[in-house]
């Protein structure tokens, strides 16, 4: 590589195979690569069962793995402590949302407020030209001079849903080295290079709830016995009682403790009234949704956008019409009714492979 193309790049290293391969590839391309891991949560209070490890990211074991990979490929490595900021910007929001009767997505908030804000700022302090991550997503510069965010080439691993909040300035300073690869290719590259994390499993749980017990975590944060109340149907008929609205999410069927001739699902959570609203499966259907904090990767042309949208990560995109409002909100109408529109989750707008933007689901239509 010619010297003029050599860049200083900070790579966010989670200790997993993806960011490890991304770091190795950037180093092989001749760049000056600096590895950084984020310390965002104190795991001292969590002990995995003997002989087991939590399937999460950002643990001390993961940071140790990242450090060893950095040593193996020959790049400097640092740990930045964002515990205080992560608590304020991600965890407190997560807890608040549940106690408002919503179901949050902390991974999007982490990308928005920590990784592509605080860590990107840290990269700039180090004089880096770019921040690189192991996300399966693509970033291209169009003929219009603007940066466009695209799905990762591997449909099974595409993570563009979690990145819809990225701005033009952030995209201009971000690299996704794995965007054109499949997971199988990444593992093969790791094995070929003898990276010690080549066969490491993928993180499955939220980093600060490593045992996946949300109820325990929320009650430790706010106390037990809060938000208990009635389970009702759409007409207000009382069908039972519950131990806390934060224990329920739209679409949930198990754990209701109600004897009923037909299957019942959670169709709404009213935290203010401390009510969990249930109904048959057809009551989960919605013709659309309202969204707040709507942001656009590239500003839309006009007040109406024809797109496809995902209302949760593993949801297949569905055709929709987005009515853009001046206050930063939007009204989204589906072509066909969709199930389980969940307040607090992200709705992300696509056109083919391109991420147009997204927002946070406020309610259903």
From Swiss-Prot:
Q: Where is this site: Interaction with tRNA?
A: 135, 345
Quote the EC number. Answer: 2.8.1.13
A GO term from the CC aspect: cytoplasm
Write out the catalytic residues in the record: 110 (nucleophile), 207 (cysteine persulfide intermediate)
Instruction: Give the intrachain disulfide bonds.
Output: 110-207
Residues spanning the signal sequence: none
Lineage top rank: taxon: Bacteria
Region labeled Interaction with tRNA — which residues?
157-159, 312-313
Task: Tell me one GO molecular function of this protein.
Answer: tRNA-uridine 2-sulfurtransferase activity
Q: Which UniProt keywords apply?
A: ATP-binding, Cytoplasm, Disulfide bond, Nucleotide-binding, RNA-binding, Transferase, tRNA processing, tRNA-binding
Pfam families to which the protein is assigned, alphabetical: tRNA_Me_trans (PF03054), tRNA_Me_trans_C (PF20258), tRNA_Me_trans_M (PF20259)
Name a biological process GO annotation.
tRNA wobble position uridine thiolation
Amino acids binding ATP: 12-19, 38, 134
Which compartment or compartments is the protein found in? Cytoplasm
Q: Which reactions appear under catalytic activity for this entry?
A: S-sulfanyl-L-cysteinyl-[protein] + uridine(34) in tRNA + AH2 + ATP = 2-thiouridine(34) in tRNA + L-cysteinyl-[protein] + A + AMP + diphosphate + H(+)
Q: What class of enzyme is it?
A: transferase
Q: Which NCBIfam families did the record assign?
A: PRK00143.1, trmU
Family stated for the protein in its record:
Belongs to the MnmA/TRMU family.
- Could you tell me what this protein does? Catalyzes the 2-thiolation of uridine at the wobble position (U34) of tRNA, leading to the formation of s(2)U34.
Q: What is this protein called?
A: tRNA-specific 2-thiouridylase MnmA
Q: Which organism is it from?
A: Geobacter sulfurreducens (strain ATCC 51573 / DSM 12127 / PCA)
Lineage of source species: Bacteria, Pseudomonadati, Thermodesulfobacteriota, Desulfuromonadia, Geobacterales
